[in-house]
């Protein structure tokens, strides 16, 4: 196994610089993009900044954050910028740059071409999945995974241990780096890391668990347990994660949804096996991806877009290796001959992708939820509680106590969800208001029973198409 060790930090290549410029411009244009789940992080941070504690609802110590590292990194920028939404967006954007650059340096370990090593960055900068996940921890997670691969192949075990610990704090699934790398070490020509290399990652993860227990009175975040419970109940159906993965990949490099582009990229990715120097990387990354995907698929976890970010990042690295392998074997060696092709690709992507990307993502994702949240803030008492299924946008704009029907930020609800019981939460946490979809979603089935018992009164002044608002058990109607 040989690596290219002549990596020039001063000359990263025009493709990488161009990709970073595209990412910077797009992120600036899409800065107002608000992902519903990102606003959950933002509300935790805003409450912390306002002195209400690191909580979703003031006075309720429930841990609904599955990425503690992302939350911690967002605190200072949120405080400086004065708005938690800007804090999470800034960290997410900076991590997107870090992810692109990290994968560039990973590929430079195996190939000599600056331009081809930067191809994953260009694909990332032109793909909608990068911007759909802005405000979430996805880019931080992919950056730490890439950095872990880099440190592994550079045999920097001590730094690798720290990086894996941080990856686990970015998303718990980072733990799958451990068995993947252990198998590579066991069956490959590598020495095991010294004991000291395990100390800091153990301390990092252990400290977070201790904090969870002392602050929230629970070792694990309620949001993670809630999603496990949703999977156990069969809420999302069988094979939902895998089917959604296949559906998402049809987008390939554009937002047009072209299957032909996807299959072309897939063939290029398969050709990555031509690059002998990268085969250990292919085995390691694919092993990690197999563990990661199996976890979500076997537990029937919800198919959230940010869960697939690592699939795209690794896929793009395989595509770049495939292009390099084909050029080395059949065409030419070096950067100069591919520059014209990459320029055409970049310009084509900008003209085809950018207008559609900006038109579809250039505004808040859930404008209806935003308007509902504002209405609740103006037409309900400040101490009122509202039960809803999707809590992020409505919770942020309503500034009301939120009861989460699916249990992400409301304690003890997830155990009912695991049993397929979407009604008992109502007895445990009776709200002042319940907002539901019209027609009802399955998760809102409790409304039917309570309505028959005469415990609900519809709020006539709430006139949002596709939604209804009820007062519960004689609570004061909306003003």
Where are these regions (language model features)?
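Hydrophobic/aromatic-rich transmembrane helices and adjacent perimembrane loops
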Residues: 167-170, 176, 258-261, 284, ...
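Membrane-embedded, lumen/periplasm-facing catalytic core of multi-pass transferases
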Residues: 345-395, 401-439, 455-479
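Hydrophobic, aromatic-rich transmembrane alpha-helices
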Residues: 100-104, 182-186, 250-293, 319-325
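Transmembrane-helix signature of polytopic, membrane-embedded enzymes
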Residues: 11-17, 86-87, 98-127, 142-143, ...
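Transmembrane alpha-helix segments characteristic
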Residues: 17-22, 164, 198-208, 276-298, ...
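Specific aromatic-rich, kink-prone transmembrane helix
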Residues: 102-105, 122-123, 140-160, 182, ...
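Membrane-lumen/periplasm interface segments of multi-pass, membrane-embedded glycan/lipid transferases
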Residues: 43-44, 50-66, 213-272, 297-298, ...
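Aromatic- and kink-enriched transmembrane "portal" helix at the membrane-lumen/periplasm boundary
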Residues: 64, 68-71, 85-102, 118-144, ...
């Amino acid at each position: 196994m040989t690596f290219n060790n002549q990596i020039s930090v001063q000359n990263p290549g025009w493709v990488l610089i161009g990709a970073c410029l595209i990412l910077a411009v797009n992120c600036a244009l899409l800065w107002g993009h608000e992902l519903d789940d990102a606003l959950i992080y933002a509300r935790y941070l805003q409450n912390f900044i306002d002195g209400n504690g690191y909580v979703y609802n003031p006075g309720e110590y429930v841990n609904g954050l599955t990425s503690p590292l992302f939350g911690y990194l967002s605190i200072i920028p949120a405080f400086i910028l004065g708005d938690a939404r800007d804090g999470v967006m800034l960290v997410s954007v900076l991590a997107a740059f870090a992810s692109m650059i990290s994968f560039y340096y990973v590929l430079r370990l195996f190939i000599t071409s600056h331009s081809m090593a930067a191809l994953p960055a260009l694909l990332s900068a032109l793909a909608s999945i990068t911007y759909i996940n802005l405000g979430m921890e996805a880019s931080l997670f992919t950056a730490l995974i890439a950095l872990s691969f880099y440190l592994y192949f550079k045999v920097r075990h001590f730094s690798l241990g720290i990086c894996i610990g941080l990856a686990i704090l970015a998303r718990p699934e980072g733990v799958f780096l451990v068995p993947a790398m252990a198998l590579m070490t066991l069956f490959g020509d590598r020495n095991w890391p010294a004991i000291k290399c395990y100390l800091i990652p153990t301390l990092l993860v252990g400290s977070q668990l201790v904090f969870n227990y002392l602050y929230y009175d629970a070792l694990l975040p309620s949001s993670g347990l809630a999603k496990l419970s949703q999977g156990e109940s069969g809420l999302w159906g069988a094979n939902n994660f895998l089917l959604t993965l296949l559906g998402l990949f049809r987008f390939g490099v554009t937002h047009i949804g072209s299957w032909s582009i996807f299959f072309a990229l897939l063939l290029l990715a398969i050709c990555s096996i031509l690059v002998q120097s990268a085969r250990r990387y292919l085995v390691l990354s694919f092993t990690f991806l197999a563990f990661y995907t199996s976890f979500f698929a076997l537990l029937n976890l919800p198919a959230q877009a940010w869960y697939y970010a690592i699939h795209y990042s690794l896929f793009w690295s395989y595509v770049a290796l495939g292009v390099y392998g084909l050029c080395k074997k059949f065409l030419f060696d070096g950067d100069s001959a591919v520059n014209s092709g990459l320029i055409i690709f970049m310009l084509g992507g900008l003209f085809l992708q950018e207008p559609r990307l900006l038109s579809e993502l250039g505004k808040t994702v859930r404008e209806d939820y935003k308007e509902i949240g504002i209405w609740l803030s103006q037409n309900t008492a400040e101490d009122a509680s509202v039960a809803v299924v999707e809590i992020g946008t409505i919770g942020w704009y309503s500034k009301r106590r939120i009861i989460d029907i699916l249990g992400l930020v409301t304690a003890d609800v997830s155990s009912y969800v695991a049993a397929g019981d979407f009604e008992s939460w109502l007895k445990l946490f009776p709200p002042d208001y319940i907002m539901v979809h019209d027609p009802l979603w399955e998760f809102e089935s409790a409304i039917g029973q309570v309505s028959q018992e005469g415990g609900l009164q519809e709020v006539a002044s709430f006139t949002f198409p596709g939604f209804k608002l009820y007062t519960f058990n004689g609570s004061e109607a909306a003003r």
